[in-house]
UniProtKB/Swiss-Prot annotation:
InterPro entries: Intraflagellar_transp_cmplxB. It comes from Rattus norvegicus. Forms part of a complex involved in intraflagellar transport (IFT), the bi-directional movement of particles required for the assembly, maintenance and functioning of primary cilia. May play a role in chondrocyte maturation and skeletogenesis. It comes from the Eukaryota. GO terms for cellular component: centrosome; cilium; cytoplasm; intraciliary transport particle B; microtubule organizing center; motile cilium. The modification Phosphothreonine is found at T283. GO terms for biological process: cilium assembly; intraciliary transport; smoothened signaling pathway. It is found in: Cytoplasm, Cytoskeleton, Cilium basal body; Cell projection, Cilium. Keywords: Cell projection, Cilium, Cytoplasm, Cytoskeleton, Phosphoprotein. This is Intraflagellar transport protein 46 homolog. Belongs to the IFT46 family. The keyword Transport does not apply.
């Protein structure tokens, strides 16, 4: 009986040891499952990366297409540099620079059709047949067409132009003043006319250069010829052009154009305006009368 009891005790211990020995193996298997899950996730991520980066683009370089080319080893080595190259991704900084545009689109607000009805109840069709916009300063169609014609340089094109007319102009002086102001602005904005001379002519800047001291000293003694001189108009033009170094020919139209252009430049020059104002404020010396008398005696006859 003692032997049987001891045998039964040993069998019970063996049965208890078996599950205790199996438990760490089960724990190890659970860790293995976690590792397998992690590895599967990383593999899936790698596959996704391969799909994103490794997917060949349409028309991309494929080395297999150029392996059969009968070229030397040096050329083949050059082809390998194509696959070795990896482009750099450069992030460009975008800077917001607000600015005022030259032209602003004239897009009006959406009409909500919140109209005040007329007292008599008649429909005014405001917003349907008549524009319901603020009374801003509208452009005159005739003046606008003149501006477009001037800017496009299309003066010789025959086209039908609308001639503006006013009814009861005596009672509407404001419209006349507006028309005069707009036309004056159009003429002021016109560039100066360009004239191509058929004969050689000096530049305006060359003619505006200072005279030599000897010539200026001579002008202090001898006055310029006036219109009272006894000569014809053609001779007087030749005389003035010769003094100002303007060449003149048989037809004096181009010489006169250059003469008046030179006069306009002197008149509009700020430098000579300041000199003229300075001479006005300057009081002449006492012997100016005697100098004037000498100048009269030495004038051209």
């Amino acid at each position: 009986m003692a032997d049987n009891s001891s045998d039964e005790y040993e069998e019970d211990n063996k049965e208890k040891k078996k599950p205790s020995q199996l438990t760490p193996q089960q724990g190890f298997s659970e860790n293995d499952d976690d590792d397998d899950d992690d590895s599967s996730e990383t593999d899936s991520d790698d596959d996704d990366d391969d799909e994103e980066h490794g997917a060949p683009l349409e028309g991309a370089y494929d080395p297999a297409d150029y392996e059969h080319l009968p070229v030397s080893a040096e050329i083949k080595e050059l082809f390998e540099y194509i696959s070795r190259y990896t482009p750099q991704l450069i992030d460009l900084d975008h800077k917001l620079k607000p600015f005022i545009p030259d032209f602003i689109p004239a897009v009006g607000d959406i009409d909500a059709f919140l109209k005040v009805p007329r007292p008599d109840g008649k429909p005014d069709h405001l917003g349907l047949l008549v524009l319901d916009e603020p009374s801003t300063k509208q452009s005159d169609p005739t003046v606008l067409s003149l501006w477009l014609t001037e800017n496009s340089k299309q003066h010789n094109i025959t086209q039908h132009m609308k001639v503006k007319s006013l009814e009861d102009a005596e009672k509407n002086p404001k419209a006349i003043d507006t028309w005069i102001e707009s036309i004056s602005e159009l003429h002021r904005s016109k560039p100066p006319a360009t004239v191509h001379y058929t004969r050689p002519m000096p530049d305006i800047d060359t003619l505006m250069q200072e005279w030599s001291p000897e010539f200026e000293e001579l002008l202090g003694k001898v006055s310029l010829p006036t219109v009272e001189i006894d000569c014809s108009l053609a001779e007087y033009i030749d005389m003035i052009c010769a003094i100002l170094d303007i060449p003149f020919y048989k037809s004096r139209i181009q010489s006169l154009h250059l003469l008046f252009s030179l006069y306009s430049e002197f008149k509009n020059s700020q430098h000579f305006k300041a000199l003229a104002e300075g001479k006005k404020t300057f009081t002449p010396p006492s012997n100016s009368a005697s100098q004037a008398g000498d100048a009269e005696t030495l004038s051209f006859l």
